[in-house]
Amino acid sequence: NAAGAILDNTVRYSTVSLGYDIGNGTFRRPQEGKRVNSLDFKTEGGGIYEGLHGMYVWGSFSYSRYKVHKAEYNASLIDPLRGMPFIIADTNRSNWVNQDYNLEMQMTTPLLWNRVIIGITGRYQNAVGAKQLDPRPLVRLSQFTVIPSVIVKFDKHALGLNFDYY
């Protein structure tokens, strides 16, 4: 709940990370590929800003580029393990080159009328994947989410609500 973030009295902070991962072996789900190489970058930061009248502001950005080698049972999906109850399968092993980036932000008002806090979360995800053995090589994924939220304080307790739109 974005509105509840200001209740933690978070200090201002920022982080940056860069990583390279290599995965290899047979202890895996078949759709993940026998070998995976990935490059990841992430930054995030936020806090309470007096210049914005005590609002809490937070944001993050992440970028990932990964190569999947010898993936099985993946017909043409960037994320074959996306929580669906069925699998679109292909018996041919394939290689993939995928990249995605995610943007996320949260903004929260200070306590209004000594009782109410209003917040909003925004998320944007974009991904492009190219199966290296297929006449339809390019697959795209985009998702935009807006989550308004509100907190009502009662002395030492608080009640929060989220409203998801995507």
Where are these regions (language model features)?
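Outer-envelope beta-barrel architecture signal
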Residues: 10-16, 53-59, 114-118, 155-161
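Transmembrane beta-barrel strands of outer-membrane/channel proteins
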Residues: 14-22, 59-65, 120-126, 161-165
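Outer-membrane beta-barrel proteins
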Residues: 25-27, 66-72, 129-133
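Extracellular loop and loop/strand-boundary signature of outer-membrane beta-barrel proteins
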Residues: 28-33, 88-93, 130-137
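Residues that define the transmembrane beta-barrel architecture of outer-membrane proteins
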Residues: 35-43, 97-103, 135-146
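Residues on the lipid-exposed face of transmembrane beta-strands in outer-membrane beta-barrel proteins
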Residues: 43-49, 103-109, 146-152
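Short, flexible helix-coil linker/hinge segments at the edges of structured domains or between repeats
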Residues: 73-87, 163-166
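Surface-exposed extracellular loop regions of Gram-negative outer-membrane beta-barrel proteins
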Residues: 108-131, 143-144
